[in-house]
Structure formats: structure tokens, C-alpha cells
Amino acid sequence: ENKFHNENIINNGGFGGAGIELPSDIEPYKFKKERGIDNYIVYVGRIDTHKGCQQLFEYFIKYKQEKNNDVKLVLMGKTVMEIPERDDIISLGFVSEELKYNVMAGADALIMPSEFESLSIVVLESLALGVPVIVNGLCEVLKQHCVISRAGTYYTNYDEFANQLDDMVCDGGLREEMGKLGVQYVDR
């Protein structure tokens, strides 16, 4: 059951927002435990070049070649492009709402690589879950959500992507603080 209520459209500092209602039985560590994963970022949406996924794969693979860490990229959504076959990229396809929220809640961050988004419900859901976001800084709307909320970061090139990912994966204190700010932002 979709928990989005469009009658609750709100104004967040000039940017439209939506009332987000999350299930009460989210288990953020369930996916990690079942898969034996410690750190991961998550992408939720159509896996498509038009959504920035080709660049996401290129940046993530380069990052993994340069860094010695165990971070994984978990994908949820319809696949319309080839996904690199790697142990550190996990595609779940379409998932139940329960699994979606459990996976999102356990992530170090949600990644949104698209340059062309308006109001992203999945970004707001992530913030409501206390999970920071990393967005493509060429998408002005998502970038401004990060700036105003202080619950996310943005990148415009590989070096910024790598730095933001390092921060989210390696700095639990920063993740926790940004997570709290995200919840406050969505609750406004």
C-alpha cells in the first residue's frame, strides 16, 4: 500500500514538499543481517541512463578501484539498462514496500544520480527515515533540498562524488547528525 498522501502538499522554504507516512514496523538491520553487508548506499528508481545510472556505475566502480572498503551499491527498481556484474553492485529488482523501507533504513545514504528530478518522493522518504542523501548537484531542485535541510550532499564530478561517499560511509557521527536534520526537515 502506497503511503503517499497528495492532500498534504506543503511548502518547505519555497520548495514543494509532501506528507510522508512511513510504516511503523521498519527493520533497518534486517537486510544487512540477511546479506552479511555492513555498509551500502541505495538507489531506488528506474535503472536507466536517463536517470544518471550509467554515470553512477562508472563513478562507483572507479571509487571501488581507488578505495579499500566494503561499501556496496544496492539497486531497487525496474532495470532498463545493463548493470555491471560485480559483487559490490546488488540489484534487487522490484521489491515489496516492506523490503524497500527496510533496505532504505539500513543504508548509509540514498544516492540520486539524476540531473532531471523535481519533487523526489524517494528522497523525502529517505530523509524521513533519517538516512542522508547524496544527489547530483546538476539537479537544482534536489541540490536545494540538500542545502536547505543540511541532511544531504551533492556532487558535480567524480572527485566530489568520492568525497561525499567517503563521508557517508566513514563518518557515523556525520550520518547520524544529517539523519536527524532530515527527519526534522520532512516533519516541517
Residue ranges and their predicted role:
Residues 132-136:
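Short hydrophobic beta-strand element within catalytic cores of glycosyltransferases
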Residues 115:
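Aromatic "clamp/platform" in nucleotide-sugar-dependent glycosyltransferases that forms part
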Residues 34-51, 57-62:
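Conserved donor-binding/catalytic core segment of Leloir-type glycosyltransferases
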Residues 77-101, 109:
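Nucleotide-activated donor-binding/catalytic signature segment of Leloir-type glycosyltransferases, i.e.
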Residues 101, 119, 124-128, 142-144:
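Short alpha-helical segment that forms part of, or immediately flanks, the ligand-binding pocket
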Residues 1-26:
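Donor nucleotide-sugar binding/catalytic pocket of nucleotide-sugar-dependent glycosyltransferases
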Residues 174-188:
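A short, well-ordered alpha-helix in the C-terminal region of glycosyltransferases
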